[in-house]
Every structure is written in C-alpha cells, then in structure tokens.
Amino acid sequence: MPRPLSATIHTSALANNLAVARRYAPKSKIWAVVKANAYGHGLARVFPGLRATDGFGLLDLEEAVKLRELGWAGPILLLEGFFRPTDIDVIDRYSLTTALHSDEQLRMLEMARLSKPVNIQLKMNTGMNRLGYTPEKFRAAWERARAAQGVGQITLMTHFSDADGDRGVDYQVQAFERGAQGIAGARSLANSAATLWHPATHFDWVRPGIIMYGASPSGVTAAIEGTGLQPAMTLASELIAVQTLSEGHTVGYGSSFKARGSMRIGVVACGYADGYPRVAPEGTPVIVDGVRTRVVGRVSMDMLTVDLTPVPTANVGSRVELWGTSLPIDDVAQACGTIGYELMCAVAPRVPVRAE
C-alpha cells in the first residue's frame, strides 16, 4: 500500500486564476507561464485549466512539443530563446515563438533554413542584467531582425526585477521607452507582480506565472488577499504515529526540540525526500484535521513531526495539509526562509500527483 502522501492539482483553481489575470489586465493578451513543468504542477495536468489562455510561455523545447501533442494550436513562447541551430528546426516545425536576446541567437536565425518566418520577442535589458540588449543597442538589433528573411512578427519585451518590491518598475519602464522609442510593434513587459500591481505596464501581452498557481509574487500571502486567487496545489498526508512526551523528552535527529511539559506529537508521512524543506524550523505552520498547528523537531528524509496540542482528538490517520487550500504555500515558504515558487518546483517525483 502506498504512503498516504499525495499532491492534488486543482483544475478549477487554475481556470479561476487565469480569469483573475484577465480581470486585472482586460485589454491585454495573456502568456500563461508554464515553465519548469508548470512550476512543478505538471504540464499535462495544468493544461485543461489554462487552455483558455492566449498563449503559453515556457523554456524547454520538449515541453513546447508536449503542448502541441496535447492539442494546443495557439502561440507558444520560448522565454529563453534557443541555444543551438538545431533548436531552430524544432521551432520551425512546431510554429513556436521565441525570445531573442543576443547577437549569437540572431546570427543563428539569419543563417537558418526555414519553411516560414519565425515570430520573435526581441528582449531589452532594462536593469535585470540577465538577458537582452541594452536600450542603447536595441534599435540596431531591431533593425537587423526586421531585415532578416527568417524573422516574422517582432514583439518588444523586457522583464522586471522589482515589480513586487519597493523599487518598483518606473526606472525600467523609462529605460524601455528610451530604447524602444520610434519602434512599432506589440509590447510585453508585465510579469505576475506587474499584472496585479502595475497596470500601466500591461500593454499588448502580460506574462503571469506564479499567480496562475495561486501564490503571491512577493512571497507574502497578505499581498494577494482580495485578488480572488486560489491555490492550485495541495500537498497532504496523514499521521502515521502519535507519541506522548513527558517534560524534557526530545524529538527527532539532534534532539533539537524538547518538550516543556506533557504533550502529544504526531508523525507525518512527509520528509525532505518528498520535497518538504529540511530547513523548516520549529513553528512552521501545518494543518491537522483542519486545525493550524506547527512543526516541531527536525524534518527527516521521510517524516516530520507536529505539535498536536491544538488538536487533542487527532490520531493515526488524521489528515495533514502541508500546504494548499487551507494553508497558503507562501506561509510555509516564509517560515522556511524561501519562496512558494521553490516549494512548488521541489515536490519530488516519488510523490503521487493527481488532477481534479
């Protein structure tokens, strides 16, 4: 019999979150970002909930091909572009749109033998300093791309570094406007945070990622209260044992937790080999039988332990929610010093996942 740990992907939540993005950016088309196997949710599992999008954004050619095999005939954007000339053959065969951020990529595209022009999103580096042409070099890149026989429609794009923070987006928008001055074409600037909080950046296409999965771009649950976003993943397990401790008794490796009095603890079938963060400290929230309580002791490879004081009726078989519809993933991530993105992507292959 399998362990009681499993993840559930909520198709209705995905559809709801896409609708939320449309409500925030009603005049823009949407690239629903499904990179990293849909942020750990599974590309095939999220497709039914997100198929009302205008396009999908991802990184891997294999995932792009999989989307085509699932029946998606609309636009697919390769957010990092391509890496070698043979990639362009796949782009051509499957009618993909690609980001283009360097002279090396442009040179490969100029030399490619294509059956039809490739639509590109020409990327400007407005301050993130990862990919793209600087504003000063952008026009020359655009003119070269426009002259290339293998290039079709050109959309202008950039990516924000601080749309969820205090610095905001104004300095990058100004850089973008400077570099794109006088250049015609659709624009794509807004990520999840900008989709929610910076409407002036919406333009023609927005690129929501984390909000498709119901989590906060800032990593703070309160920041998305009132948006209508819903968690798209629930990670749940059960208590597989209950121990009663006396004062001074310890729990787990390193004896890091010591009982201050008589108490019951529950042992949960979930550990760091399942993707739960080993660094989760005492106090990390968890839900047992619908009641919020806390992790105590170190997280082990296959198990973790929780305080049952607030849940006196809990016993073996009691349901445990590690994160999901009753416990925002950002609350868990914040306690662990990380972000919900990482927890989503870290769910291990050995965890059974189903969509509903």
UniProtKB/Swiss-Prot annotation:
Gene Ontology process terms (BP): D-alanine biosynthetic process
Function: Catalyzes the interconversion of L-alanine and D-alanine. May also act on other amino acids.
The name this protein goes by in its record: Alanine racemase
Residues of the active site: K35 (proton acceptor), Y253 (proton acceptor)
GO function terms (MF aspect): alanine racemase activity; pyridoxal phosphate binding
Modified residues (N6-(pyridoxal phosphate)lysine): K35
Domain of life where this protein originates: Bacteria
CC terms in the record's Gene Ontology section: cytosol
Family, per entry: Belongs to the alanine racemase family.
Keyword Phosphoprotein belongs to the record: no
Cofactor(s) the protein needs: pyridoxal 5'-phosphate
Alphabetically ordered keywords of this record: Isomerase, Pyridoxal phosphate
EC number: 5.1.1.1
Catalytic activity, as annotated: L-alanine = D-alanine
One Pfam family per UniProt: Ala_racemase_N
Residues given in the record as substrate binding sites: R130, M301
Pathway: Amino-acid biosynthesis; D-alanine biosynthesis; D-alanine from L-alanine: step 1/1
